[in-house]
Amino acid sequence: IFTVTVLFIYFGYIIMELGWKLNVSSHLPIVREVGGRLIGNFSDVVITFFLFGALTAMIAGAGALFHQEFDLHPLLGSLFMVTVTVITVLGGFNSIINSISFVAPFLVLSAVIVSIVTLLTAPPLSQIEQSVIERPVMLRNWLWASILYISYNIIPSISILGPLGNQTQNRKIIRNGALLGGIGLGIGAAAIYLTLYIKADSIK
């Protein structure tokens, strides 16, 4: 988790600084600057694919949530998410940033609260340790897992972090933003990990 947090801070700072230097309005100038025209164009396709995949998962997840929590048809949840997404995008880049600024702290706070409740209601530590020892190892290489986690989170974020860096006034703001954002994501990751670690036996 510490490695993930450091990498979030580092790559977030690099991407926003490039966006500030290159005066970008999209991710394309950044990936071309880093990888050249050929690799940059390929990266553009990859980022677009990741964004489309994330959008599809988000819409499907909203449908599943509406069905599970409210016993409504999944299509209603998907249509609701599509409507909110379209309205947000039509509002421009500032509208997207405002929505992220509202949702992201709420998600991190929710993860922390769930983790705290899980810790307070968990069995004694000795029982947890015993159950973990008897449990098969899910990921054997923590470094490789950290790199993969960072990769699929950072790649689609370039399209937001680049233009966001362009709107900042100096490197100090970029540095502070990357630091706070990385720490926040690290706290969220730690909270999720602790919850899954303790409740792994109940996950099916």
Which residues does each PLM region occupy?
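Juxtamembrane transmembrane-helix boundary signature
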Residues: 2-31
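Membrane-interface loop-to-helix entry segments
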Residues: 62-63, 75-76, 88-119
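Hydrophobic alpha-helical segments and their helix-loop junctions in multi-pass secondary transporters
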Residues: 48, 85, 89, 107-133, ...
